[in-house]
Amino acid sequence: MNEETAKEWLKKAERDLKAADVLLREGIYDYSLFHSQQAVEKYLKAFLTYHNKHFGKTHNIPLLIDLCQSI
């Protein structure tokens, strides 16, 4: 378990989620969607990191989901 690195991923994901919320309220939908996607990716990476599951350098959310399901 790599708890500290997982916590770092969670902090980054939370910042992206907050940014997405602010942008959504301002009607800036494309950037809100971008930060939402970034948050999802980072939450998945936090989970994988916590469970010591290697994911390499990727932005492939379906792959990350598959890796999470394999745990």
What are these regions (language model features)?
Residues 1-71:
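Terminal alpha-helical segments
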